[in-house]
């Protein structure tokens, strides 16, 4: 039996972030909708061709999205919140953008949909909204249109569709509460209609993604799979697709389903392939996700060959990426500045396609020449194990010497809070921001000129100093209580720190999509991590010299740096996090010596790092909390430690949030209408909290009354004396006009509430 290969999805944004640029041009009114649609067509055609040329047998169609693939599925099903609907009930691309951003070139602005993390990745999806009795219909034919495009170009394709149960699982009920699973029978007819349309086009296989099957689902959700897939069978062959973890705990449900194939992630998952092979129906195709879609490391193809060869001819087999290549940069060949040895350790999306092709060829026709090719390809990643670039004896010794005293503050929170109140004398409802201010074209140009050698260090520092001075002056004028320096010197909250730590390397074009048009360029952790010199002290000290008000020192926490980087795979995540924590612990100490009394250690990714299965949570939370405390505990009692978290469901990890022992935690809550505070109320969270009062991901400016109402809602759950007032997140992606207006309204809302207390 010939083995075929396929990818589960491909990066959408383009090698030069063409999609991002086209989206933002269209949103700004600088280009037409047709010009935007043309960019999408060109990117899809290029990406299909690139995969085919790299040796991929079946290219995915339906993985492209204008904003997010879950949002695309919502539109496919006609699930558009009433506030975003067109007057005539039609659905167009601006409908999609209004749901994602809150506004579009046409239609009335309205609050954007909630956004949260896609499983345990750094990609974000738009949360589907459900209401009792809502109707579903095929409302958006993007998938079918793109299938027609790909077929017209002569590609062998495999359409990709987010499965119905995972779709419902990912959504939220709005308004009157009910069981969203009860909507299953309402959405299945749309899925049937889509599959029928695909069958008409001669499609043989459809990849139907059900990553919820790696979770510990409630029994009623597991029970729903059988009738759902009974309703979907018969029109095309269904490849039930899972990723991000193992499926062994749900195998009884899976193997009883009326599907024709199963894809499993054997990179992240730990399913025994021999047992899995034995337990599945003999006629099923088994697709093995052997090439890591979430990291940048070259695969050891010789090892994979040895592991997979016993399965050849046991059943129909495909080889695939572990998950969509969405999470990987596109092309390593674009990286012209990487050291040759380090570059030889990496593979980006196109190289991963070539890896699939090479491994498939070797398994289909194993001969000495092919095995030698596998060995030659795998040699660099094997040689890395003994590279001096990877190991630092001093770091390893310091890590081994950590004691329990190193991770505890000197005094408990209540005693620290008293010393901090005396030091800072802040008003009730203290106002602050999360850290960054708008990254203007001028700021980005300044950094780029410095990076490319067109600007010397002295003039660069002068330019950055001017932007910091401007940010401090703006905050003083607005009347904020605790200021920030604005982070003009930082391109990205993780990349900036990685650039100043040993053990990291950086790419030129290693962009991956975070959400919508937002792309990030994660650093790669290649070895042991240390801090050669202070990173943030110069700018924090300068900013503090400009004002009598406290200025926060701003650090990205160890768990977030780990989660938002491509990590090394030869040591545990715990080891990496604690190495980063030790490096940043020294930074906390240096900031204190420079007179900085409030230090924020951002951990927006803390929850995102959770394993997908609860059985594995406790071990992760223990070392994640310890890493944060190792970073922070060197601070003196009158130094106020803040932390910030994003997109979190906190109720199931409140013990660990409290265990961080941060003096103040700021969280994103505005999109969820403060419902996240219920977790803190139920837990009786003891420290101070800054619930975000407006959504910085939307350009809409909140009114004073809106902010005041949210703060009143917050005060019903948290004592007012422990509440701070702040936006949801950093302001780097916003413009100055809306930033000024929103912050002015926020400060005024806080002042009104203070006046009531007098």
UniProtKB/Swiss-Prot annotation:
<comment type="similarity">
    <text>Belongs to the vitamin-B12 independent methionine synthase family.</text>
</comment>
<protein>
    <recommendedName>
        <fullName>5-methyltetrahydropteroyltriglutamate--homocysteine methyltransferase</fullName>
        <ecNumber>2.1.1.14</ecNumber>
    </recommendedName>
</protein>
<feature type="binding site">
    <location>
        <position position="117"/>
    </location>
    <ligand>
        <name>5-methyltetrahydropteroyltri-L-glutamate</name>
    </ligand>
</feature>
<dbReference type="Pfam" id="PF01717">
    <property type="entry name" value="Meth_synt_2"/>
</dbReference>
<dbReference type="GO" id="GO:0009086">
    <property type="term" value="P:methionine biosynthetic process"/>
</dbReference>
<dbReference type="GO" id="GO:0003871">
    <property type="term" value="F:5-methyltetrahydropteroyltriglutamate-homocysteine S-methyltransferase activity"/>
</dbReference>
<comment type="function">
    <text>Catalyzes the transfer of a methyl group from 5-methyltetrahydrofolate to homocysteine resulting in methionine formation.</text>
</comment>
<keyword id="KW-0489">Methyltransferase</keyword>
<keyword id="KW-0808">Transferase</keyword>
<feature type="binding site">
    <location>
        <position position="602"/>
    </location>
    <ligand>
        <name>L-methionine</name>
    </ligand>
</feature>
<keyword id="KW-0486">Methionine biosynthesis</keyword>
<feature type="binding site">
    <location>
        <begin position="434"/>
        <end position="436"/>
    </location>
    <ligand>
        <name>L-homocysteine</name>
    </ligand>
</feature>
<dbReference type="InterPro" id="IPR013215">
    <property type="entry name" value="Cbl-indep_Met_Synth_N"/>
</dbReference>
<dbReference type="GO" id="GO:0008270">
    <property type="term" value="F:zinc ion binding"/>
</dbReference>
<feature type="binding site">
    <location>
        <begin position="518"/>
        <end position="519"/>
    </location>
    <ligand>
        <name>5-methyltetrahydropteroyltri-L-glutamate</name>
    </ligand>
</feature>
<feature type="binding site">
    <location>
        <position position="646"/>
    </location>
    <ligand>
        <name>Zn(2+)</name>
    </ligand>
</feature>
<feature type="binding site">
    <location>
        <position position="602"/>
    </location>
    <ligand>
        <name>L-homocysteine</name>
    </ligand>
</feature>
<feature type="binding site">
    <location>
        <position position="564"/>
    </location>
    <ligand>
        <name>5-methyltetrahydropteroyltri-L-glutamate</name>
    </ligand>
</feature>
<keyword id="KW-0028">Amino-acid biosynthesis</keyword>
<dbReference type="Pfam" id="PF08267">
    <property type="entry name" value="Meth_synt_1"/>
</dbReference>
<feature type="binding site">
    <location>
        <begin position="434"/>
        <end position="436"/>
    </location>
    <ligand>
        <name>L-methionine</name>
    </ligand>
</feature>
<keyword id="KW-0677">Repeat</keyword>
<feature type="binding site">
    <location>
        <begin position="17"/>
        <end position="20"/>
    </location>
    <ligand>
        <name>5-methyltetrahydropteroyltri-L-glutamate</name>
    </ligand>
</feature>
<comment type="pathway">
    <text>Amino-acid biosynthesis; L-methionine biosynthesis via de novo pathway; L-methionine from L-homocysteine (MetE route): step 1/1.</text>
</comment>
<feature type="binding site">
    <location>
        <position position="487"/>
    </location>
    <ligand>
        <name>L-homocysteine</name>
    </ligand>
</feature>
<feature type="binding site">
    <location>
        <position position="644"/>
    </location>
    <ligand>
        <name>Zn(2+)</name>
    </ligand>
</feature>
<feature type="binding site">
    <location>
        <position position="729"/>
    </location>
    <ligand>
        <name>Zn(2+)</name>
    </ligand>
</feature>
<dbReference type="InterPro" id="IPR002629">
    <property type="entry name" value="Met_Synth_C/arc"/>
</dbReference>
<feature type="active site" description="Proton donor">
    <location>
        <position position="697"/>
    </location>
</feature>
<dbReference type="InterPro" id="IPR038071">
    <property type="entry name" value="UROD/MetE-like_sf"/>
</dbReference>
<feature type="binding site">
    <location>
        <position position="487"/>
    </location>
    <ligand>
        <name>L-methionine</name>
    </ligand>
</feature>
<dbReference type="GO" id="GO:0032259">
    <property type="term" value="P:methylation"/>
</dbReference>
<keyword id="KW-0862">Zinc</keyword>
<feature type="binding site">
    <location>
        <position position="668"/>
    </location>
    <ligand>
        <name>Zn(2+)</name>
    </ligand>
</feature>
<dbReference type="InterPro" id="IPR006276">
    <property type="entry name" value="Cobalamin-indep_Met_synthase"/>
</dbReference>
<keyword id="KW-0479">Metal-binding</keyword>
<feature type="binding site">
    <location>
        <position position="608"/>
    </location>
    <ligand>
        <name>5-methyltetrahydropteroyltri-L-glutamate</name>
    </ligand>
</feature>
């Amino acid at each position: 039996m010939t083995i075929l290969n396929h990818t589960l999805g491909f990066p959408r944004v383009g090698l030069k972030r063409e999609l991002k640029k086209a989206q933002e041009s269209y949103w700004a009114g600088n280009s037409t909708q047709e010009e935007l649609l043309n960019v999408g067509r060109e990117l899809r055609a290029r990406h299909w061709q690139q995969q085919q040329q790299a040796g991929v047998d079946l290219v995915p169609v339906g993985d492209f999205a204008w904003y997010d693939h879950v949002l695309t599925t919502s539109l496919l099903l006609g699930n558009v919140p009433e506030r975003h609907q067109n007057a005539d009930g039609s659905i167009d691309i601006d409908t999609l953008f209004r749901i994602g951003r809150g506004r579009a070139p046409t239609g009335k602005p309205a609050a954007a949909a909630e956004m949260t993390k896609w499983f345990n990745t750094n990609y974000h999806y738009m949360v589907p909204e459900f209401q009792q009795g809502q109707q579903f219909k095929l409302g958006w034919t993007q998938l079918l249109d793109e299938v027609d495009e790909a077929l017209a170009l002569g590609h062998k394709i495999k359409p990709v569709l987010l499965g119905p149960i995972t779709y419902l699982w990912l959504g939220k009920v709005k308004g009157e509460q009910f069981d969203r699973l009860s909507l299953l029978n309402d959405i299945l007819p749309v899925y049937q209609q889509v599959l029928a349309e695909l069958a008409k086009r001669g499609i043989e296989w459809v990849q139907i993604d059900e990553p919820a099957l790696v979770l510990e689902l409630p029994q009623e959700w597991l029970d729903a799979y059988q009738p759902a897939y009974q309703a979907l069978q018969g029109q095309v062959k269904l490849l039930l697709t899972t990723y991000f973890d193992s499926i062994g705990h749900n195998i009884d449900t899976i193997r009883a389903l009326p599907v024709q194939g199963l894809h499993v992630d054997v990179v992240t998952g730990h399913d025994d392939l021999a047992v899995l092979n034995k337990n599945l129906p003999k006629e099923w195709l088994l697709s093995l996700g052997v090439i890591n879609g979430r990291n940048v490391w070259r695969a050891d193809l010789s090892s994979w060959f040895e592991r997979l060869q016993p399965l050849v001819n046991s059943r129909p087999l495909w080889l695939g990426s572990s998950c969509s290549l969405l999470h990987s940069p596109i092309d390593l060949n674009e990286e012209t500045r990487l050291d040759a040895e380090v570059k030889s350790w990496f593979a980006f999306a196109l190289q991963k396609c070539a890896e699939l092709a090479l491994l498939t060829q070797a398994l289909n026709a194993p001969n000495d020449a092919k095995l030698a090719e596998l060995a030659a390809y795998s040699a660099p990643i094997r040689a890395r194990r003994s590279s001096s670039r990877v190991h630092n004896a001093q770091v390893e010794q310091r890590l081994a010497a950590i004691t329990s005293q190193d991770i505890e503050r000197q005094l408990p929170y209540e005693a620290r809070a008293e010393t901090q109140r005396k030091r800072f004398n802040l008003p009730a409802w203290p106002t602050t921001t999360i850290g960054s201010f708008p990254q203007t074209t001028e700021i980005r140009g300044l950094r780029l000129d410095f990076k490319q050698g067109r600007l010397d260090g002295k003039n660069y520092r002068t330019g950055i100093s001017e932007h910091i001075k401007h940010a401090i002056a703006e905050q003083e004028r607005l009347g904020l209580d605790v200021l920030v320096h604005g982070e003009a010197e930082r391109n990205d909250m993780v990349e900036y720190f990685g650039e100043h730590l040993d053990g990291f390397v950086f790419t030129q074009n290693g962009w991956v999509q975070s959400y919508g048009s937002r792309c990030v360029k994660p650093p790669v952790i290649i070895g042991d991590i240390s801090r050669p010199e202070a990173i943030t002290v110069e700018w924090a000290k300068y900013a503090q010299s400009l004002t009598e008000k406290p200025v926060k020192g701003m650090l990205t926490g160890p768990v977030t740096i780990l989660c938002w980087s491509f990590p090394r795979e030869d040591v545990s995540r715990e080891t990496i996090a604690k190495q980063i924590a030790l490096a940043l612990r020294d930074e906390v100490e240096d900031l204190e010596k420079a007179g900085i009394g409030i230090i924020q250690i951002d951990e927006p990714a803390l929850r995102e790092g959770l394993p997908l299965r609860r059985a594995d949570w406790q071990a992760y939370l223990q070392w994640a909390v310890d890493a944060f405390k190792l970073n922070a505990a060197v601070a003196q009692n009158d130094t106020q430690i803040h932390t910030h978290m994003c997109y979190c469901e906190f109720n199931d990890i409140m013990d660990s949030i409290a265990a961080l022992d941060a003096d103040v935690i700021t969280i994103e809550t505005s999109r969820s209408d403060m419902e996240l505070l219920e977790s803190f109320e139920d837990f009786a969270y003891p420290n101070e909290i800054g619930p975000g009062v407006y959504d910085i991901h939307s350009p809409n400016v909140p009114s004073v009354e809106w902010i005041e109402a949210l703060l009143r809602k917050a005060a019903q759950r948290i004592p007012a004396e422990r509440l701070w007032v702040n936006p949801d997140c950093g302001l780097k992606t916003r413009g100055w006009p809306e930033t000024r207006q929103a912050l002015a309204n926020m400060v005024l809302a806080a002042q009104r509430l203070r006046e009531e207390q007098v």
